[in-house]
């Protein structure tokens, strides 16, 4: 909406001619600009505050050349929207179909109610979180206790396991001794066989 469109809307709402609506808009704007220029603030309840803000000296950069430029301290106009204006735009407050969009005294009710309701929900969330933590703590204690019992039962099993290999080793020792004996007997039986072969050789020589 531009200035001309704003004047048209005011002409219809005020039920007056265009000249009077134009004068009303221009006078309002002129008054705000002059007051802010002086350093004063213009407050419209429910709508917002027009004020002057002071900016300190700073260092900026030229976007074209990339050079560093020193900016002197300056004053800029600023607008702070009111609580009721914010509530209407955000949807927290319903915009009335008829009458003024913002009224004096309407802001305090919904804004305070919403502010009080939020901490209540936060406190409830904290309460449930502490309850959950309290329930969770015994579960952890029980979990740590269970492995302790398991370890206690496991200890005798290890002792038995170490005994078993000892018996096995004891039985294995005679087996090796027997194995060593066996080749000795074989060697003993093999020796006469060679002797017999030596005796047989001279017999062949005599026949020739």
Swiss-Prot record:
Q: What is this protein called?
A: DNA-binding protein HupB
Keyword list, A-Z? Acetylation, Cell wall, Cytoplasm, DNA condensation, DNA replication, DNA-binding, Iron, Iron storage, Methylation, Oxidoreductase, Secreted, Transcription, Transcription regulation
Q: Which reaction does it catalyse?
A: 4 Fe(2+) + O2 + 4 H(+) = 4 Fe(3+) + 2 H2O
Q: What does altering residue 55 to A do?
A: Significantly reduces protein level in vivo
Which organism is this entry from? Mycolicibacterium smegmatis (strain ATCC 700084 / mc(2)155) (Mycobacterium smegmatis)
Q: Which SUPFAM superfamilies match?
A: IHF-like DNA-binding proteins
Listed Gene3D superfamilies: IHF-like DNA-binding proteins (4.10.520.10)
Q: Which residues carry this modification: N6-methyllysine?
A: 3, 86, 94, 103
Specify the effect of residue 86 to R: Wild-type growth, no overt gene expression changes, 20% survival on INH, reduced ability to form SCV on INH
**Which parts of the chain span the membrane according to its record?**
none
Q: What is its quaternary makeup?
A: May form oligomers. Interacts with RNase E (rne).
Q: Where is the composition biased (Basic residues)?
A: 113-208
Q: Where is this region: C-terminus, required for nucleoid localization?
A: 92-208
Give the EC number: 1.16.3.1
Q: Where does it sit, as one GO cellular component term?
A: extracellular region
PROSITE patterns, from UniProt?
HISTONE_LIKE
């Amino acid at each position: 909406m531009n200035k001309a469109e704003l004047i048209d809307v005011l002409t219809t709402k005020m039920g007056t001619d265009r000249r009077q609506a134009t004068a009303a808009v221009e006078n309002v704007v002129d008054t705000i600009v002059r007051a802010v220029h002086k350093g004063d603030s213009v407050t419209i309840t429910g709508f917002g505050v027009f004020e002057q803000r002071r900016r300190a000296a700073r260092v900026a950069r030229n976007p074209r050349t990339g050079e560093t430029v020193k900016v002197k301290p300056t004053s800029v106009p600023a607008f702070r929207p009111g609580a009721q204006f914010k509530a209407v735009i955000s949807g927290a407050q319903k915009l009335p179909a008829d009458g003024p969009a913002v009224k004096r005294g309407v802001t305090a009710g919904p804004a305070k109610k919403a502010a009080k309701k939020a901490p209540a929900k936060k406190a409830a969330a904290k309460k449930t979180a502490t309850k959950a933590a309290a329930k969770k703590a015994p579960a952890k204690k029980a979990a740590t206790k269970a492995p302790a019992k398991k370890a206690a039962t496991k200890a005798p099993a290890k002792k038995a396991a170490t005994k078993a290999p000892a018996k096995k080793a004891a039985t294995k020792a005679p087996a090796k001794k027997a194995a060593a004996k066996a080749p000795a007997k074989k060697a003993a039986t093999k020796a006469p066989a060679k002797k017999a072969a030596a005796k047989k050789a001279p017999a062949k020589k005599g026949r020739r």
